[in-house]
């Protein structure tokens, strides 16, 4: 118990230190400085796009790293790795709030017509970022609970199935991140098709797990996770 309390305190302090460092870095961010100083509507819009793109790239990088970390830790019954991923999710939620506040302040510097025309896309981007972080948390939570309670691990077949689809998802996230970093969305239809294919694979895996439950050929707790 003492060790767990110590770990919780360490994680909290570490998160706060990282959060303060990120905020200090944002204060020194040249894009944000220019955003808040400019009075030219066109320039403000261009800078807001740049800032939003930079922030969404960071969110995609977070998602890529922590999705892989969560699944790998679950497959290898690594409780410490899962706790680290969950701590990262809590920290990232704080950064999302800061990102939204900064973006909203920048939006207030645009004229009303531009806000009406472009504002929806900005808020959709924020929702997209929040959903990614929330999804990683929702993925990590049952995995952490499962391992923490020493429930039966995945069998070899299940590990193989989920390892394969995990690699494909991480690779897709990498491609999307690189496209956003370079602001080059040529042939993006290929990534959309790949995402749809992955959704199909996940649906197939879900049906396989339901079949295992019905035939009682595996652990119900494992299949539910």
Which residues does each predicted region cover?
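Cytosolic, long alpha-helical scaffolding segments
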Residues: 1-225
């Amino acid at each position: 118990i003492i060790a767990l309390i110590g770990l919780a305190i360490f994680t909290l302090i570490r998160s706060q230190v990282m959060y303060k460092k990120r905020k200090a870095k944002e204060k020194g961010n040249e894009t944000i400085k220019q955003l808040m100083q400019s009075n030219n509507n066109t320039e403000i819009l261009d800078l807001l796009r740049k800032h939003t793109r930079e922030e969404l790239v960071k969110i995609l990088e977070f998602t890529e790293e922590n999705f892989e970390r969560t699944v790998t830790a679950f497959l290898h019954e690594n409780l410490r790795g899962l706790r680290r991923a969950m701590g990262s999710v809590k920290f990232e939620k704080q950064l999302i709030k800061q990102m939204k506040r900064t973006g909203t302040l920048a939006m207030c510097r645009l004229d009303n017509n531009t806000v009406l025309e472009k504002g929806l896309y900005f808020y959709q981007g924020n929702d997209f970022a929040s959903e990614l972080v929330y999804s990683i948390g929702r993925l990590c939570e049952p995995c952490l609970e499962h391992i923490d309670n020493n429930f039966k691990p995945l069998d070899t077949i299940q590990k193989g199935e989920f390892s394969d689809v995990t690699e494909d998802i991480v690779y897709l996230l990498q491609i999307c991140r690189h496209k956003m970093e370079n602001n080059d969305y040529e042939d993006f239809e290929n990534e959309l098709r790949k995402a749809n294919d992955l959704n199909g694979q996940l649906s197939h895996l879900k049906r396989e797990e339901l079949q295992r439950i019905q035939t009682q050929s595996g652990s119900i707790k494992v299949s539910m996770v």
